[in-house]
């Protein structure tokens, strides 16, 4: 957003227009009117920071209207060089409306810069009652303003710090909410072949729907911590720096001093703690270990590329950053692994790198398959449950899932891919099976230790990852009844595509992530 300096004449003209709009709403609806603007010092009244904070303020007002059962008869908003403006004609007692506005102004970090005037039926503004403190020194604000104690630059800098902090806290909480919502939505998608859903426990005997709910609840703080890890790491490395440094400057410093691999290293101990929290919540059952890794890395990647002015980065930037964070560590550690986990054992036996390799490659299964397929299904009119169930089939048909490989061996994993492909591409299944489902022989136990696992994986991905457009245009949409029948077959064979379930959760998370407020 380009910042533009305005003149005193423009400020006065905008003020007159606001009064005219307020009076017009009062006359038309005969109810109290809220006039919402931002208190921005200096000649620049509209910035990227103020615009994002203003949008958040509107969200808070709408939530307050709903919670208090206030009826909004009219709403108008506009973004001008003189600042953002919003007007609400609210059918409620003016005193109650003012109380709501004061509560928002005082409870929100950004609220110090909110100017939520309430105009009563007599055309007069209701007073706050308690004077607001100065944003720079904390003394009574009117005294500082009348005596010009602080320069406009000082007030502007203090205001920017407030907005940056407020937007960081808001977006950190939003990341946690969206990640938790994605986990709950994923387990709720029904039917899912071999997986826990609302209908049954899939091929599992040690977990059920409530296990996943308990696990998701236990992980709520983890996602926020991952998003904020960059700030925490920077704070440790830069103790003793000038406390007046703005969050924006600190972000620039972080990108210069903390590498992607170092961010990943900082994430690992809190990921281990999240696993312990999950096990404590589920009685020792592993419900979300894969998601703790994958979504945790993504939340950390978002935190690395987040700015208060721009908000969340694009999906491509997030996935590229996740790859940069994990690739170096994977290349160093996986060949030297001690085979303590099932994934490491499968790497030694078949050369498959599992979810760690998928993340290190930038999650191509999500970028090229599941996310475009899911959005295409929604565009075709499917509800989110059906769209997600179909998306899961595309993942099963196109991803080398180590959970399937662990439970069913090469033959079981190949069978699962074939069945999913048959539902999606029945007319050309025989041809597609040869092209997109690697034969069991390609996953035979590795005997040549000189074979490059990464090259082998990339070779398979060229086959397993057809263009999303081809997937969408060439496939049919299986019914929920057909998917439920496949669920029964997976359960009978004790197969569970847990890796694909994690990728579905990632898909739902990224789809819900706003790239701008």
Feature map (PLM): residue ranges:
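Phosphate-rich cofactor/ligand-interacting catalytic cores and adjacent structured alpha/beta frameworks
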Residues: 161-229, 264, 302-425, 468, ...
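A short glycine/serine-rich beta->alpha loop
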Residues: 276-289, 379, 488-497
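Long, hydrophobic/aromatic-enriched structural stretches that serve as scaffold segments
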Residues: 224-232, 258-304
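Long, contiguous binding/interaction regions
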Residues: 1-64, 96-99, 103-122, 126-168
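Short, amphipathic C-terminal "tail helix"
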Residues: 492, 496-517
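A generic, well-ordered mixed alpha/beta core segment in the N-terminal half of proteins
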Residues: 102, 106-109, 273-277, 293-321
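Short, well-structured hydrophobic secondary-structure segments
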Residues: 33-91, 207-212, 217-230
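Intrinsic disorder/low-complexity segments
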Residues: 1, 230-258, 425-477
């Amino acid at each position: 957003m380009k910042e533009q300096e305005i003149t005193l004449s423009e400020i006065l003209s905008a003020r007159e227009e606001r009064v005219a709009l307020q009076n017009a709403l009062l006359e038309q609806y005969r109810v109290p009117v809220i006039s919402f603007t931002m208190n921005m010092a200096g000649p620049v009244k509209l910035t990227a920071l103020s615009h994002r904070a203003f949008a958040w303020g509107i969200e808070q007002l709408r939530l307050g209207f709903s919670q208090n059962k206030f009826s909004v008869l009219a709403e108008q908003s506009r973004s001008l060089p003189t600042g953002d403006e919003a007007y609400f004609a609210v059918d409620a007692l003016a005193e109650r409306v003012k109380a709501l506005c004061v509560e928002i102004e005082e409870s929100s970090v950004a609220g110090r810069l909110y100017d939520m005037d309430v105009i009563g039926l007599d055309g007069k503004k209701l007073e706050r009652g308690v004077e607001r403190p100065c944003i720079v020194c904390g003394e009574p604000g009117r005294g500082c303003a009348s005596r010009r104690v602080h320069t406009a630059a000082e007030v502007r800098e203090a205001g920017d710090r407030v907005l940056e902090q407020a937007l960081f806290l808001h977006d950190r909480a939003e990341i946690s909410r969206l990640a938790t919502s994605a986990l709950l939505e994923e387990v709720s998608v029904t039917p899912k072949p071999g997986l826990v859903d609302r209908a049954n426990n899939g091929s599992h005997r040690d977990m059920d729907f409530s296990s996943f709910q308990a696990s998701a609840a236990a992980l709520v703080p983890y996602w926020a911590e991952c998003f904020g890890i960059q700030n925490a790491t920077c704070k440790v490395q830069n103790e003793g720096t000038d406390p007046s440094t703005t969050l924006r400057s600190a972000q620039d410093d972080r990108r210069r001093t903390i590498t992607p691999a170092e961010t990943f290293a900082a994430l690992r101990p809190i990921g281990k703690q999240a696993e312990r929290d999950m096990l404590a919540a589920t009685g020792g059952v592993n419900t979300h270990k894969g998601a703790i890794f994958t979504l945790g890395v993504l939340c950390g990647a978002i935190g690395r590329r987040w700015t208060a002015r721009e908000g969340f980065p694009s999906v491509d930037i997030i996935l590229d950053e996740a790859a940069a964070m994990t690739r170096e560590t994977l290349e160093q550690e996986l060949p030297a692994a001690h085979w303590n986990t099932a994934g490491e054992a499968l790497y030694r036996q078949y050369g498959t790198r599992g979810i760690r390799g998928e993340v290190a490659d930038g999650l191509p299964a999500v970028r090229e398959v599941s996310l475009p397929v899911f959005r295409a299904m929604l565009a075709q009119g499917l509800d989110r449950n059906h769209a997600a169930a179909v998306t899961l089939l595309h993942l099963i048909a196109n991803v080398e899932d180590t959970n399937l490989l662990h439970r069913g061996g090469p033959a079981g994993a190949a069978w699962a891919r074939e069945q999913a492909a048959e539902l999606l591409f029945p007319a050309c299944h025989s041809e597609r099976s040869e092209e997109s489902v690697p034969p069991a022989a390609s996953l035979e136990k590795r005997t040549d230790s000189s074979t490059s696992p990464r090259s082998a994986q990339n070779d398979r991905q060229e086959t397993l990852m057809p263009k999303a457009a081809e997937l969408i245009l060439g496939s049919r949409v299986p019914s929920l009844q057909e998917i439920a029948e496949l669920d029964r077959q997976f359960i009978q064979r004790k197969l569970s595509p847990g890796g694909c379930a994690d990728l579905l959760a990632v898909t739902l998370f990224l789809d819900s992530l706003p790239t701008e407020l």
